Amino acid sequence: MRDLEKQFHESAAWEQRPKPTTTAPEPRDLDLKDSSVLIEKIQQMYDVLRLALESDSTRLITLFLSFTTPPLKLPGVTQDTHNLTHHGGSPEALAQLEIIERAGLAKFSGLLDGLKTAQEQGAPLLDRTMVLFGSVMGDANTHNNANFPLLLAGGGFKHGQHLAFDKTNNTPLANIYVSMLQRLGIGSEKFATSNGTMRGLEMA
């Protein structure tokens, strides 16, 4: 009970603490019915996300991105994204998916660069922020929700590596959440279907 009371007092103090200011322009409203602006909208969302962390307006953000739209107005893309994910191995469809995913990942890379440039207490904000990026499908072509591709950046973990696991007897996805909770200082040994922490994920 005492720990909970301390959390309430800390939250109240945080509300009264002066927040950093920004000179960033106010985001302009975009019409999502126009498929040409989806990538720009993603850029806006990442900009707002970064500013929220920089200003200490929040410490936790969840962002869901949906590419289920009419064909994006990107060079080389002629079909809508959802149909392309059911590619059936078609080289043409896979090539178009690559164009879309490269455009989206370029914006994600910009988010990481922005967090790396921003400073908090003398350290890059990225070093003090865990950023988990992933998909709701391991293979959208077959609606297979196993073997999710995930990217974890920042947070003081050792990066620059690719961890792969047995596809038939895989490591539970929830293990990475246990590792992240422990990095946050939450002494949790279990989350959902986890059976430990994420093997191979170490602190820098």
Give the predicted meaning of each segment.
Residues 1-204:
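Ligand-binding pockets and gating/stacking loops
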